[in-house]
């Protein structure tokens, strides 16, 4: 009689995805981030569920309900801070996961890559709406500024913004619908994650060399389950250090002031994980141009497979491509820093140069490096 995990209709799927899955023998720690993202998502849904039990999505009580969670609910403070800082861990893992995909040419698995981009947009939308919920100053003004960007759309822009707001400004209707969407989106994300994995398991995982690894596969369990558990422990260690020692390090002090539509904070900025895109948005003086650049800064990932000119899949044996990749990483750090700075000299020009570099590296220099490396290989 066959083992139950191999014969049971439901356990069979889990077995083929997590236990007997043939995995390349040489995948490095960079392949840990997929499972870490799964853990982050589960953690966010769990902590979010407990927060939703005590939160009220009303402009009059939202701020005080968050205070109530921190002061009066049993371990409410730690649930709230795990949720808030868990989002930061989520984005750290997300950026490293996407970076790994770019470095090792994983974007050549088209379906997996495109679902991943949809997931990135969905997670960003969820995080943005979650930031609005505590109804502090930065929540309110962040929501006002970001939703207002849609008014740059010709002809229908203003109507679209008022439709999203549910009125003529960010108010009770906006907060209520943002809470509803913030609650439902993680479950949609979970469904998309399953599709993401489904497409990945059609082709099997990529590996650092970018070569076909069918001749050398090992079972996922116990090798990579143990490796993933080590990753979980390290991530939880970092998360708990953040939560227990400096829970407000990544937040904004302005969010401890209740939302006031009559008082604008001196520097409106989103959470740190959106700052690179925010810097690109601000570097273009035209409103519509800025919005398009903001969207393109993420949508550019769709073009990755089309811009791949190299005969090799991975950057592992491509020194010129590697240099450009790490310059791009440095450029993203500069953009993140600029996004948090006031709009004044010299930050404006630095942001504009960094934005030009971002698009130049991805659209022009990386494809040219691929062509050049192909020619060097033939010498």
Swiss-Prot record:
<dbReference type="InterPro" id="IPR027387">
    <property type="entry name" value="Cytb/b6-like_sf"/>
</dbReference>
<keyword id="KW-0999">Mitochondrion inner membrane</keyword>
<feature type="transmembrane region" description="Helical">
    <location>
        <begin position="320"/>
        <end position="340"/>
    </location>
</feature>
<comment type="function">
    <text>Component of the ubiquinol-cytochrome c reductase complex (complex III or cytochrome b-c1 complex) that is part of the mitochondrial respiratory chain. The b-c1 complex mediates electron transfer from ubiquinol to cytochrome c. Contributes to the generation of a proton gradient across the mitochondrial membrane that is then used for ATP synthesis.</text>
</comment>
<feature type="transmembrane region" description="Helical">
    <location>
        <begin position="288"/>
        <end position="308"/>
    </location>
</feature>
<keyword id="KW-0472">Membrane</keyword>
<feature type="transmembrane region" description="Helical">
    <location>
        <begin position="77"/>
        <end position="98"/>
    </location>
</feature>
<dbReference type="GO" id="GO:0045275">
    <property type="term" value="C:respiratory chain complex III"/>
</dbReference>
<feature type="binding site" description="axial binding residue">
    <location>
        <position position="182"/>
    </location>
    <ligand>
        <name>heme b b562</name>
    </ligand>
</feature>
<comment type="subunit">
    <text>The cytochrome bc1 complex contains 11 subunits: 3 respiratory subunits (MT-CYB, CYC1 and UQCRFS1), 2 core proteins (UQCRC1 and UQCRC2) and 6 low-molecular weight proteins (UQCRH/QCR6, UQCRB/QCR7, UQCRQ/QCR8, UQCR10/QCR9, UQCR11/QCR10 and a cleavage product of UQCRFS1). This cytochrome bc1 complex then forms a dimer.</text>
</comment>
<feature type="transmembrane region" description="Helical">
    <location>
        <begin position="226"/>
        <end position="246"/>
    </location>
</feature>
<feature type="binding site" description="axial binding residue">
    <location>
        <position position="97"/>
    </location>
    <ligand>
        <name>heme b b566</name>
    </ligand>
</feature>
<feature type="binding site">
    <location>
        <position position="201"/>
    </location>
    <ligand>
        <name>a ubiquinone</name>
    </ligand>
</feature>
<keyword id="KW-1133">Transmembrane helix</keyword>
<feature type="transmembrane region" description="Helical">
    <location>
        <begin position="178"/>
        <end position="198"/>
    </location>
</feature>
<dbReference type="InterPro" id="IPR048259">
    <property type="entry name" value="Cytochrome_b_N_euk/bac"/>
</dbReference>
<dbReference type="InterPro" id="IPR016174">
    <property type="entry name" value="Di-haem_cyt_TM"/>
</dbReference>
<dbReference type="InterPro" id="IPR030689">
    <property type="entry name" value="Cytochrome_b"/>
</dbReference>
<dbReference type="Pfam" id="PF00032">
    <property type="entry name" value="Cytochrom_B_C"/>
</dbReference>
<keyword id="KW-0830">Ubiquinone</keyword>
<dbReference type="InterPro" id="IPR036150">
    <property type="entry name" value="Cyt_b/b6_C_sf"/>
</dbReference>
<dbReference type="Pfam" id="PF00033">
    <property type="entry name" value="Cytochrome_B"/>
</dbReference>
<dbReference type="InterPro" id="IPR048260">
    <property type="entry name" value="Cytochrome_b_C_euk/bac"/>
</dbReference>
<keyword id="KW-0813">Transport</keyword>
<keyword id="KW-0812">Transmembrane</keyword>
<dbReference type="GO" id="GO:0008121">
    <property type="term" value="F:ubiquinol-cytochrome-c reductase activity"/>
</dbReference>
<protein>
    <recommendedName>
        <fullName>Cytochrome b</fullName>
    </recommendedName>
</protein>
<keyword id="KW-0479">Metal-binding</keyword>
<feature type="binding site" description="axial binding residue">
    <location>
        <position position="83"/>
    </location>
    <ligand>
        <name>heme b b562</name>
    </ligand>
</feature>
<dbReference type="GO" id="GO:0046872">
    <property type="term" value="F:metal ion binding"/>
</dbReference>
<dbReference type="GO" id="GO:0005743">
    <property type="term" value="C:mitochondrial inner membrane"/>
</dbReference>
<keyword id="KW-0679">Respiratory chain</keyword>
<dbReference type="InterPro" id="IPR005797">
    <property type="entry name" value="Cyt_b/b6_N"/>
</dbReference>
<keyword id="KW-0349">Heme</keyword>
<feature type="transmembrane region" description="Helical">
    <location>
        <begin position="113"/>
        <end position="133"/>
    </location>
</feature>
<keyword id="KW-0496">Mitochondrion</keyword>
<dbReference type="InterPro" id="IPR005798">
    <property type="entry name" value="Cyt_b/b6_C"/>
</dbReference>
<comment type="similarity">
    <text>Belongs to the cytochrome b family.</text>
</comment>
<feature type="transmembrane region" description="Helical">
    <location>
        <begin position="33"/>
        <end position="53"/>
    </location>
</feature>
<dbReference type="GO" id="GO:0006122">
    <property type="term" value="P:mitochondrial electron transport, ubiquinol to cytochrome c"/>
</dbReference>
<feature type="binding site" description="axial binding residue">
    <location>
        <position position="196"/>
    </location>
    <ligand>
        <name>heme b b566</name>
    </ligand>
</feature>
<feature type="transmembrane region" description="Helical">
    <location>
        <begin position="347"/>
        <end position="367"/>
    </location>
</feature>
